[in-house]
Amino acid sequence: MIAVIIAGGSGTRLWPLSTSTQPKQLLALTGERTMVQQAYDRARKLGDTIYVVTEASHAGALRAQLPELPDEAFLIEPGRRGTAHCIVLALDYINRHHDQTEPIAFIHSDHNVRDAQGFAHSFDTAARVSRECGCITLIGIEPTFPSTGFGYIQRDGVIDVQAGVYNVESFKEKPDYETAKQYVESGNYLWNCGYFVGSVDVFRNEMQRSAPDLWSNYQTLASIADFGSEAYNHAYLALDNQVIDIALIEKAHQLAMVSASFDWMDIGNFKDLHDA
């Protein structure tokens, strides 16, 4: 499995601790290693091939924090164009250099996860499910309280009860407290942590079916011979800003979801940091 660490966020909700020039993924908030270094440690449990997608202004700091990775492992956005296009950029690069059928795990650089073994187990399950169903497979977090700060995924129907694998019924935006309480009490909703697994082929097929605009943007980048060239960067900067959940995931014709077997926290504010 290939791991792609998404490391382009600004983390301004933790200002002044985290700033646009020194975002939270570059800080040691929950231990001796920084958030992105901890994400790298977890990514190593998934496989030997690891990429980091980031915006140009953070590339130098990330290279300094992850000296184990070669220069070509850093996939640089010339400017932020949203999570949808940073993932498209990664898919294009991986398609040029790897097997199109190899599963890819997209993970975030600023989440707090203590159970690295459980993390790896969940992603191994997601990779297996994605291969079997030919679909993008999400990781969902069983909610421990009625959070109003996270989106929710409604599960519908069991694919593999022993492995905790489900079909996806719907997505819910961040709810008010009473709605969140209903979600948790129903037992049918998981937190959407933004983790997903699928091969280049799986993502390309789903873009063609469900997100023609995103597919067109992928084709534009893939048609340029030199990845990262001036022409490539010019084309990338001409793209609009899109979030992957809205641009593709919520439109997908078929999805599966694995219930995570690890603890998780998105440190989005000072209360989350205190709880972590």
Pin down the residues of each PLM region:
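Short coil/turn connectors at secondary-structure junctions
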Residues: 1, 47-48, 70-71, 100-102, ...
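Conserved N-terminal catalytic core of the sugar/cofactor nucleotidyltransferase
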Residues: 1-5, 13-17, 23, 28-108, ...
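Solvent-exposed alpha-helices and their adjacent loops that cap or buttress functional pockets
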Residues: 6, 44-45, 97-99, 105-106, ...
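Active-site glycine-centered loops adjacent to acidic/histidine catalytic or metal-binding residues
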Residues: 9, 110, 269
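A short acidic, often aromatic-flanked loop/helix-cap motif at beta-alpha or helix-coil junctions
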Residues: 80-84, 145-147, 177-179, 264-265
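Short, well-ordered, mixed-charge alpha-helical segments that flank or form enzyme active sites
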Residues: 112-116, 145-150, 179-180, 204-205
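Basic phosphate/pyrophosphate-binding loop/patch that engages nucleotide-derived ligands
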Residues: 116-162
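Catalytic core of tubulin tyrosine ligase-like
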Residues: 152-276
